[in-house]
Amino acid sequence: HPVDRRQRQMCIRDSADIIIEKEFETAAVHQGYLETHACLVSVSPDDRTTIWSSSQGQFMVRAMTSFITGIPQSSIRAIPAEIGGGFGGKTIVYLEPVATILSKKSGRPVKMVMTREEVMRASGPTSGSKSKVKIGAKNNGKITAAQGTFYLQAGAFPGAPIRGAAGCCLAPYDIPNAHTFGYDVVSNRSKVAAYRAPGAPIG
């Protein structure tokens, strides 16, 4: 049930012998994988499509390519290639639908490889963040109450991994009174993408 701010503060203060408050910040960093996004696509005259891709999610590649091109998923075979690093950054589909359309039009296999500059412009880093944590505990070390507030930088569009941060921060502990708050902060920068369990390390 909802608890107002004053009640939360009283809950921490009244249940604890000691209260610790800390603030943490993380920078927005790109996944920095060694090899850039790449794919090779071959479409036969009957729309049988084979995709070799360095994606981390072949089922997403197949589904998104089908959605964009209109080719049934049953006619698309997505084969994973060596990833060359990904860390979450290669879960988003960029090249494969485009290469599929070009292969279908040309009747020839099409290979597409992003340059490093294209990767930095098209993909996204993880969110920068600011976190405020307040924890109350007894003298014997038992945590009695905690509150976490997370501000995650989302870029030009909402979509920062708030759930990961707010959901993971207090998860390892059995805390009788715990509250987390997450804010998806839109800012003048590129969109964000997954990076190593999105949001969880921030929490």
Name each region found by the language model.
Residues 1-12:
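Single conserved hydrophobic/aromatic residue that forms the stacking wall/gate
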Residues 17-19, 39, 48-50, 74-77, ...:
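Structural motif
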Residues 16-29, 112-119:
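Short Pro/Gly-enriched beta-strand edge/turn motifs at strand-loop
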Residues 5-6, 22, 60-66, 71, ...:
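Gly/Pro-rich active-site capping loops and adjacent beta-alpha segments
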Residues 39-106, 152, 160-170, 194-203:
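Alpha-helical support elements that line or immediately flank enzyme active sites
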Residues 35-40, 130-132:
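Short glycine-rich loop/turn motifs
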Residues 18-22, 33, 40-43:
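Active-site cores of enzymes that catalyze phosphoryl transfer or operate on phosphate-rich substrates
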Residues 31-35, 125-127:
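A short catalytic or substrate-binding loop motif that flags glycine-/basic-rich loops and adjacent residues
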